[in-house]
Design a protein with these regions (language model features):
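Short acidic/glycine- and proline-prone juxtamembrane loop motifs at membrane-interface regions
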Residues: 184-190, 375-376
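Transmembrane-helix motifs of polytopic, lipid-linked glycan transferases
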Residues: 125, 137-160, 340-343
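Membrane-lumen/periplasm interface segments of specific transmembrane helices
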Residues: 49-65, 228-341, 345-358
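Transmembrane-helix signature of polytopic, membrane-embedded enzymes
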Residues: 133-136, 153-175, 193, 209, ...
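Specific aromatic-rich, kink-prone transmembrane helix
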Residues: 152, 172-175, 190-209, 228, ...
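Signature aromatic-anchored transmembrane alpha helix within multi-pass, membrane-resident enzymes
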Residues: 272-276, 395-423
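Short hydrophobic/aromatic helix or loop-helix immediately within or flanking a transmembrane segment
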Residues: 83-101, 105-131, 310-314
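Membrane-interface alpha helices of multi-pass inner-membrane proteins
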Residues: 195-200, 208-235, 277, 362
Length: 429
């Protein structure tokens, strides 16, 4: 867009534009004189939560029967090979197929094209340096990325949420029901770290530096589409505000947000286009290698057994969860909960980068995701929303209750989901 387009005047309550972002607020999040460095405090909370999750996982492993991935009571290394971790190992040993496997009906079967290459490549590099086997190296990569994600989220959101509240948020995310995934050979931790870094840089108006990080995020997990959508929505909002098409009352929905200058809007637009292009790299690579334009999407839908139909899976799966007649009620409740969360002032106060990311990712899940039991794991990219929770739940007792609820959720998720077959319960009323 033309650099000469002037931004509209700020509403009376809005602060003046500041290209440095929230550096003044970030300074207020620094520890007082004599206190430990901020990073040490964040890593201390992260380490305590991560260690607790590891202890719970090792206790649960003792009750795990024989599984497709190993014998009963698996060791730590065997435990790391569960579920999708094996697909990443196959990428290194077998690569990506040039011919998509198909069943007797011609439908594409599950294969490695569904998994992005960044995690196995980093794990291979780690193995070459440390000599560790793949699953140990991949877990080490995830653990490192997990720590980086905690630091990145805190640096990005502590200036908005408050220093102490940010530590609570770190504890809530790393004590959430699916927190074990952040230390296993899954790409969730890597994707979260890169997404937080890219959005945090965009929040500070450093769009050029954010570009390569956003591209790496697109090669870690299928995160490129919602990331580009979030950035695009943010740019459209800024453009509409600059042209005076957004009433002051509507602008107040994102309190404290500093409007972008014309040059910054151009930078955000460039980052949006770059991220959108990066999101297409992996589907294009699958097309180039296999000769099938739909190689990536056909592979992704192999897990659901049907073609990609936006929004349709939520209609059908809601009945799978609670029954055909209660399904619409469940879906309505989920939509209402998502709307209430996005409408909360605490989340809106985190700034446009955080709010548009959460909105874009929720829309992405509703449009393209098949809500199986993996839905809980795939909510982890909404981690920035945890920085709004301390403002909604005030007082140590309420926050401690949230924390305890997350730990209880871990007990259930580890024993019922990760440790396949550990618990066999026949419910009675």
């Amino acid at each position: 867009m033309p650099a000469s387009t002037p931004p509209s005047p700020n509403p009376p309550s809005a602060p003046a534009a500041d290209p440095r972002g929230d550096e003044d607020a970030r300074a207020s999040a620094s520890p007082g004189p004599g206190g430990p460095p901020r990073a040490v405090r964040v890593l201390g909370v992260w380490a305590a939560c991560t260690l607790l999750t590891l202890v719970l996982a090792r206790l649960g492993a003792q009750d795990t029967p024989a599984t497709p991935w190993g014998g009963s009571a698996p060791s730590w290394l065997e435990h790391m090979a569960f579920w999708d971790a094996g697909w990443y190992e196959r990428i290194l040993t077998e690569g990506y197929p040039s011919v998509l496997p198909a069943g007797a009906d011609g439908a594409v079967q599950q294969n490695t094209w569904a998994f992005m290459p960044l995690l196995p490549l980093l794990a291979a590099a780690s193995s070459s340096v440390t000599g560790l086997p793949f699953y140990a190296s991949a877990a080490l990569v995830s653990l490192t990325a997990s720590a980086a994600a905690a630091l990145g989220l805190d640096r990005w959101l502590a200036p908005r949420a408050g220093a102490r509240q940010s530590l609570w948020a770190v504890a809530l995310v790393w004590s959430s029901p699916c927190a074990l995934i952040l230390q296993t050979p899954y790409a969730e931790a890597l994707g979260l770290a890169l997404t937080a870094a890219a959005l945090g840089l965009a929040h500070r108006r450093r769009f050029l530096i954010a570009a390569p990080i956003a591209a790496l995020a697109c090669l870690s997990r299928p995160i490129g589409v919602p990331l580009a959508a979030a950035l695009g929505l943010w740019w459209a909002w800024e453009l509409a505000c600059a042209r005076g098409r957004v009433p002051d009352a509507v602008r107040a929905l994102l309190p404290g947000a500093r409007p972008l200058t014309a040059r910054q809007r151009l930078g955000l637009l460039g980052l949006t286009a770059w991220t959108g292009a990066a999101a297409l790299v992996w589907p294009a690579a699958a097309w180039a290698v296999t000769g099938r334009m739909d190689a990536y999407t056909a592979t992704e839908t192999a897990w659901r057994g049907e073609h990609l139909a936006p929004f349709q899976p939520w209609l059908t799966r809601s009945g799978w969860w609670v029954g055909e007649h209660l399904g619409p009620v469940l879906l309505a409740a989920v939509l209402a909960l998502a709307a209430l969360g996005l409408a909360s002032r605490a989340l809106r106060s985190l700034g446009p980068a955080a709010w548009f990311w959460c909105a874009g990712y929720v829309i992405y899940l509703l449009a393209f995701f098949d809500p199986t039991t993996s839905v809980f794991r795939l909510l982890l990219p909404l981690a920035p929303a945890a920085w709004a929770l301390p403002a909604l739940v005030r007082g140590r007792r309420g926050r401690a209750a949230l924390l305890l609820g997350g730990v209880v959720g871990q007990l259930v998720w580890i024993s019922w989901v990760w440790d396949l077959g550990s618990v066999a319960i026949r419910w009675v009323p």
